[in-house]
């Protein structure tokens, strides 16, 4: 076992090599949306491109380089078609006749109103060998050369980047022949994802259809009406109210608008604010001929300067450009600039509309991807840039053989100790009792739904049915609730819960009935989890009014887990050999606030198993240092869990208290890391885990296996044989595993689709092993991972990632609710600067600190 010192920088960090291929399971023929890329054994030439003025959007840079290549054809470029990435990297198939010298050129683009001149300098950087890349793909080299992969990526993206609107690794074009409004001035654009990936023996182009939300190009007045639900602008005869203005500001701040009152000169501006005063009252200092300044209203100015009588002088203005410059534009002369992606979080309704518009059954998606590639619509005829470099992309999906792993059997308890065998990722609890059910003697009900919506007889019927089902499940709720009252609003949660805790000794559970989406939920969890240490179970009023055995049974799954029960366990004899010695499973995740929400911090969560099954878990959670305080080169450390040593230490101590064993192995499943950051994150985290062990005992060195779990990727698997498709959506069966053909040429990774796809196309999870002291075989790790997907307490189905990784997400997500500030967040003030509601790091840390009575329970279930 290697000792981990402070060790090499991430760049030298070498993940373990693949220990061979898995063999367990029933073979299945599959197709993957990876398309083989043939590359010649040539060198390509890498040049640095420096464009002044800097900080122009990539779109402009591309135009500059495109113009430069045409303009300096005779002197420099000849017939070469360079690939360019929109920033500083350019690649050619043949060297430019400039040697190693820097060449300076001047390029003019026709601008809006006046032409723009750019100074461009080009200088040789290096020769990039595709021959080396081919050797790496054949498994002859330890590492895949990044520079060759980058060169290929830039070359294959060059044409689509000129032709479409790039977003990350995807390309979108404006809607033609379809229109999917999302409301609030947003609409769906369809496009495709493309990325080159090294695979066994070949480079692959991963191509997928994708969709995202864009802002509709429309007049700002219409945009405002959509955002504020104003049916007809003529009804809005008064100025906006404060709350309307705040809501409108939140949506429009940061967007680009273009003006319509200057004829062809459609100048573009970025919105920084919305004025409090209407255009008829908003003033600014107007410079007069004589050098003096006089206060002038925006409405007056537009009348004098443009002879434009404003139609809506009572509406506010947009403040654009830099805040200190006081540039104001009336709403009615502005349009939203086309092609702006929506990075703000979609509302619940928008998300559901989006899913309806974009979900495709697996066969439909397969058909759509094939059509896209074959029609060459992604390249609109043969791509001259690919041709230049002698690159050929095959237009058939890659065929491969996967395996369907056997599902584990699950042990239940009660008198008859039944065993459930999952079928297609699903099993049933009917006729079975929990492995260890909790007896509930003292419990309370608090109904926050109004009495007219949820009458007393409905409440009574609900509690009776819940008691019956709980008894069947082996978690008997004995007797009527000791307390059952109606309440209103988040403010009544704390006094009511305090009263309950003081009055009823041994109170085990509070069932809370909620009227739909409400701030009461966050408050119930804050008070229950962090303030008083009480178990709470929320239920939506619609599920009380219309009860189903399924819903009640699912409630019991959650309640039993929260109270320390065990729903079921993996049948011991079928578990992999890692269970022969004490082992702890850790799940870790970092969740970031939605884009455009710089005020909120990132949250890191780590959970650890607390028994040998593994079924019970304990959680630790921390607020990460805010992003502003981190310098640019350390930005990836935002992803690193900052207090990991202490978190793991707590979990190891707790494991020892629970089991009286010290784990000899630590299996760490890490979610929430993007591909580009894996190695930078893994190294410091491995050292932190090691430190946690050594801090307990100098020579305590359990073997660590570090696995990154990724769901956010574009690999999709399809059944080659139609008869193997499963369910309405025609997906691959649960348990489908792939560790060859489309996986890494030498590293230890695999795809596993552990869940039964219900809607749309299943997305297999990707697992990448970055460290392994425990010398897992492919079969052992794949089976272990699949079995852990069956141990998630909230449902009787296999889920898409292992339970520990899933729990870490739940814990981080719950901490978001603990951070909701009753006084600020619900009111949504207009512009709160700095960190989360101006609360300091200590206050944030305290807000997510779980009460000691709750700390060692699965409160997050």
From Swiss-Prot:
Annotated InterPro entries: AGO4, ArgoL1, ArgoL2, Argonaute_Mid_dom, Argonaute_N, PAZ_dom, PAZ_dom_sf, Piwi
Keyword Ribonucleoprotein tagged: yes
Cited PROSITE patterns: PAZ, PIWI
Domain Piwi: 509-820
A Pfam short name: PAZ
Single GO BP term: negative regulation of apoptotic process
Region (Disordered): 825-846
Keywords for this protein: Cytoplasm, Ribonucleoprotein, RNA-binding, RNA-mediated gene silencing, Translation regulation, Ubl conjugation
GO molecular function: double-stranded RNA binding; miRNA binding; RNA endonuclease activity; single-stranded RNA binding
GO cellular component, one term: nucleus
PAZ domain boundaries: 219-338
UniProt modification remark: Ubiquitinated on surface-exposed lysines by a SCF-like E3 ubiquitin-protein ligase complex containing ZSWIM8 during target-directed microRNA degradation (TDMD), a process that mediates degradation of microRNAs (miRNAs). Ubiquitination by the SCF-like E3 ubiquitin-protein ligase complex containing ZSWIM8 leads to its subsequent degradation, thereby exposing miRNAs for degradation. ZSWIM8 recognizes and binds AGO4 when it is engaged with a TDMD target.
Subcellular location per the Swiss-Prot or TrEMBL entry: Cytoplasm, P-body
Keyword hit for Ubl conjugation: yes
Similarity field: Belongs to the argonaute family. Ago subfamily.
Matches recorded under PANTHER family: EUKARYOTIC TRANSLATION INITIATION FACTOR 2C
Role, per record: Required for RNA-mediated gene silencing (RNAi). Binds to short RNAs such as microRNAs (miRNAs) and represses the translation of mRNAs which are complementary to them. Lacks endonuclease activity and does not appear to cleave target mRNAs. Also required for RNA-directed transcription and replication of the human hapatitis delta virus (HDV).
Record's subunit section: Interacts with EIF4B, IMP8, PRMT5, TNRC6A and TNRC6B. Interacts with ZFP36.
Protein name per the record: Protein argonaute-4
Organism: Homo sapiens (Human)
Gene: AGO4
């Amino acid at each position: 076992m290697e000792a981990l010192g402070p060790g090499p920088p991430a760049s030298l960090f070498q993940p373990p090599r693949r220990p061979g291929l898995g063999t367990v399971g029933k073979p299945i023929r599959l197709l993957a949306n990876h398309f083989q890329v043939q590359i010649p054994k040539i060198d390509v030439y890498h040049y640095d491109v420096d464009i002044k003025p800097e900080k122009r959007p990539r779109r402009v840079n591309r135009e500059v380089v495109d113009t430069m290549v045409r303009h300096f054809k005779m002197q420099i470029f000849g017939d070469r078609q360079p690939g360019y990435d929109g920033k500083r990297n350019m690649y050619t198939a043949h060297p430019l006749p400039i040697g190693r010298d820097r060449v300076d050129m001047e390029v003019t683009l026709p601008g809006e109103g006046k032409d723009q001149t750019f100074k461009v300098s080009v200088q040789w950087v290096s020769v990039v060998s595709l021959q080396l890349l081919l050797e790496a793909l054949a498994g002859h080299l330890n590492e895949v050369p990044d520079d060759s992969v980058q060169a290929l990526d830039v070359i294959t993206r060059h044409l689509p980047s000129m032709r479409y609107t790039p977003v990350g690794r995807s390309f979108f074009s404006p809607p033609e022949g379809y229109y999917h409004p999302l409301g609030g001035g947003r609409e769906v654009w369809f496009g495709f994802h493309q990325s080159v990936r090294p695979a066994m023996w070949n480079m692959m182009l991963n191509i997928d259809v994708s969709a995202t939300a864009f802002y509709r190009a429309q007049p700002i007045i219409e945009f405002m009406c959509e955002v504020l639900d104003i049916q007809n602008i003529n009804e809005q005869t008064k100025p906006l109210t404060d709350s309307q203005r705040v809501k409108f500001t939140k949506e429009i701040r940061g967007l680009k608008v273009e003006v319509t009152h200057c004829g062809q000169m459609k100048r573009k501006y970025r919105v920084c604010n919305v004025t409090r005063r209407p255009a008829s009252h908003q003033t600014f200092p107007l410079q007069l001929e004589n050098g003096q300044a006089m206060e002038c209203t925006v409405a007056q100015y537009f009348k004098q300067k443009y002879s434009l009588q404003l139609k809506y002088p009572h509406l506010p203005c947009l403040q654009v450009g830099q805040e200190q410059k006081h540039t104001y534009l009336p709403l009615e002369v502005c349009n939203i600039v086309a092609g702006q992606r929506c990075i703000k979080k979609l509302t619940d309704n928008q998300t559901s509309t989006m899913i309806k518009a974009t979900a495709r059954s697996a066969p439909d998606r397969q058909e759509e991807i094939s059509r896209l590639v074959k029609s060459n619509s992604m390249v609109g005829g043969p791509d001259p840039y690919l041709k230049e470099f002698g690159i050929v992309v095959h237009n058939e999906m890659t065929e491969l053989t996967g395996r369907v792993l056997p599902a584990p059997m699950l042990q239940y308890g009660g008198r008859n100790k039944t065993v459930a065998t999952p079928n297609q990722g699903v099993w049933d609890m009917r006729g079975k009792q929990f492995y260890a059910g909790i007896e509930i003697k003292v419990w309370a009900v608090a109904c926050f739904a109004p009495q007219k919506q949820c009458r007393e007889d409905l409440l009574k019927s609900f509690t009776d049915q819940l008691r019956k089902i709980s008894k069947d499940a082996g978690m008997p709720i004995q007797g009527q609730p000791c307390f059952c009252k109606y309440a209103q609003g988040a403010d009544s949660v704390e006094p009511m819960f305090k009263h309950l805790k003081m009055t009823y000794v041994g109170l085990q559970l509070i069932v809370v009935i909620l009227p739909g989406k409400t701030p009461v939920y966050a408050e119930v969890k804050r008070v229950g989890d962090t303030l008083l240490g009480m178990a709470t179970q929320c239920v939506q009023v619609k599920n009380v009014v219309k009860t189903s055995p399924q819903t009640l049974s699912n409630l019991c799954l959650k309640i039993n887990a929260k109270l320390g029960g065990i729903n079921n366990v993996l049948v011991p004899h079928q578990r992999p050999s890692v269970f022969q010695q004490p082992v702890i499973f850790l799940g870790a995740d970092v969740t970031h606030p939605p884009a455009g929400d710089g005020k909120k911090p990132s949250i890191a969560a780590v959970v650890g198993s607390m028994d040998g099954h593994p079924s019970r878990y304990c959680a630790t959670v921390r607020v990460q240092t805010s992003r502003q305080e981190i310098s640019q080169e350390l930005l990836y450390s935002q992803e690193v869990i900052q207090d990991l040593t202490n978190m793991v230490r707590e979990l190891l101590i707790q494991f020892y208290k629970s089991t009286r064993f010290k784990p000899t192995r630590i299996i760490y499943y890490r979610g929430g890391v993007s591909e580009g950051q894996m190695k930078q994150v893994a190294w410091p985290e491995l050292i932190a885990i090691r430190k946690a062990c050594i801090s307990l005992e100098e020579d305590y060195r359990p073997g660590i296996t570090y696995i990154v779990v990724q769901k956010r990727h574009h690999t999709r698997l399809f059944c080659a044989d139609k008869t193997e498709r499963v369910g309405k959506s025609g997906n691959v069966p649960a348990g489908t595993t792939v560790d060859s053909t489309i996986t890494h040429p030498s590293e230890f990774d695999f795809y596993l689709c552990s869940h039964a796809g219900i809607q749309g196309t299943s997305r297999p999870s990707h697992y990448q092993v970055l460290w392994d002291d425990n010398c897992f075989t492919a079969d052992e790790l794949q089976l272990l991972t699949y079995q852990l997907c069956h141990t998630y307490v909230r449902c009787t189905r296999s889920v898409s990632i292992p339970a520990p990784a899933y729990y870490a997400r739940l814990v981080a997500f719950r901490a978001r609710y603990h951070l909701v500030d009753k006084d600020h967040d619900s009111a949504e003030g207009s512009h709160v600067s700095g960190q989360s509601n101006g609360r300091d790091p200590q206050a944030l840390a305290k807000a997510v600190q779980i009460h000691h009575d709750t700390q060692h329970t699965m409160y997050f279930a």
